[in-house]
Regions:
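Structural motif
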Residues: 54, 63-65, 86-89, 101, ...
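Short beta-strand segments
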Residues: 89-91, 124, 147, 177-181, ...
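Phosphate-binding glycine-rich loops and their immediate beta-loop-alpha structural context
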Residues: 131-243, 247
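Phosphate-interaction motifs
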Residues: 1-166
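Flexible glycine/proline-rich
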Residues: 2, 21-25, 30, 34-35, ...
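Solvent-exposed alpha-helices and their adjacent loops that cap or buttress functional pockets
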Residues: 47-49, 58, 77-83, 96-98, ...
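Short glycine/threonine-rich loop/turn motifs
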Residues: 182-183, 191, 204, 208-314
Length: 378
């Protein structure tokens, strides 16, 4: 029986190498970088004012002669024709003149207004460097700005833009087909509505994976073979992700159609797993119970084909008994502690609706409140 870690490696090894493409920065949100990016210059690029106020040549309280105004974007050397020698009005973000001891905010001045050159302004005592943003205080030149495999979040995109970067090399989003169904799927009295297709679609989008199309099964191996061939020829996916049809039942149609590895991973839920190919296209086979599908996609598909946040450790809010021989992935939410939500069974979809994380419970252990566990953001 495989461990979850071993199976994750096997899934990744079965997939083609991620292709690299160059995209405009404004189109790169949630994509994954393919190479490190370093800062080409420090940020801020120069000492600048944190406030609208006056640039002072010294920190002493007193009344100062007012000099020319320095606006954001002005070169102080051209405005002043030399170092600072008076109290000069300065705007937020403006480059600080040579010789500036501190910035005093306009609201601390008397009068509280920007005066014309030649007038006099009274200011309180200030501390050296007050309200001056120093060169490189956010990022030094050459520092790592974004690393390979980082997800391009809005803030990371803004940091790249602040360096004058307008395009990036990213891993091309993987394209998948989603295969769900079975003869039981439908809306009759004994039928089951398909929850797995929308679940997998939403999880794929969150992981930065494109859904190219869908395949529905009806427990007929010949029909599924035809559906696979037609959908793959039409959509040219990087992989197919199936849900259900791989366990030990009489109608395990996915397992009947595909050649590959089918076995068990020592985890609950999501024990049955499979890795196969169809006409040279990788097929990742997940179990069909909704929570098993959820857990399996998060652990094995999202990291291999897209992006998933790294797990981290937090203390448990309440004690729990682990299963004797299997690692367990319970659903829960995390604040300062990990809180388990709902029961352990793999059909309890509604009870998992508020979950934000998977909580990993080691096999054969009793964990008490306050002991740390590994959690996986969903």
């Amino acid at each position: 029986m495989r461990t979850p870690e071993t199976h994750a490696r096997e899934v990744a090894a079965a997939l083609p190498a991620r292709q690299v493409t160059t995209v405009a920065l404004h189109r790169a949100q949630d994509m994954v970088l393919s190479a490190d990016i370093h800062a080409g210059f420090p940020s801020p690029r120069f000492d600048n004012s944190q406030m609208d106020g006056y640039a002072l040549p010294q920190c002493a309280a007193g009344t100062y002669l007012v000099g020319p105004t320095i606006a954001a974007g002005d070169d102080p050397i051209r405005v002043l024709n030399g170092p600072l020698g008076a109290a000069c009005p300065i705007m937020t973000g403006a480059k600080v003149p040579e010789g500036t001891a501190a910035i005093v905010p306009i609201e601390h001045c008397e009068p509280q207004e920007f005066l014309s050159p030649g007038a006099r302004i009274t200011v309180p005592e200030t501390s050296p460097g007050q309200f001056i943003r120093r060169t490189g205080s956010d990022l030094e030149e050459g520092a790592l700005l974004a690393a390979r495999d980082d997800k391009l979040t809005p803030v990371r995109l803004a940091a790249l833009a602040s360096q004058g970067i307008d395009e990036v090399e990213v891993s091309r989003p993987a394209r998948i087909l989603i295969c769900t169904g079975g003869a039981e799927i439908g809306h009759g009295n004994a039928a089951i509505p398909d929850a797995n297709a929308p679940l997998l679609t939403a999880m794929a989008h969150r992981a930065g994976i494109e859904v190219a199309g869908y395949i529905a099964t009806n427990d007929d191996p010949q029909a599924l073979t035809h559906a696979f061939a037609e959908a793959i020829a039409l959509n040219h996916p990087d992989a197919v992700v199936t849900s259900g049809g791989i366990s030990a039942g009489k109608f395990e149609v996915v397992r009947q159609v595909l050649d590959g590895w089918f076995g068990h991973v020592d985890q609950q839920p999501g024990g049955p797993q499979g890795i196969a190919t169809f006409h040279d296209t990788p097929v990742i086979c997940l179990p069909g119970n909704p929570i098993s599908t959820l857990v399996s996609f998060r652990l094995f598909v999202a990291p291999a084909l897209g992006w998933a946040p790294e797990p981290f450790r937090v203390p448990l809010a309440a004690g729990i008994e682990g299963l004797p021989h299997k690692k367990q992935f319970r659903r829960g939410r995390v604040d300062s502690h990990a809180h388990i939500l709902g029961g352990a069974s793999s059909h309890l979809l509604a009870q998992a609706a508020d979950a934000t994380h998977l909580i990993r419970i080691p096999a054969g252990q009793r964990l008490e409140a306050g002991e740390e566990v590994e959690v996986y953001p969903l």
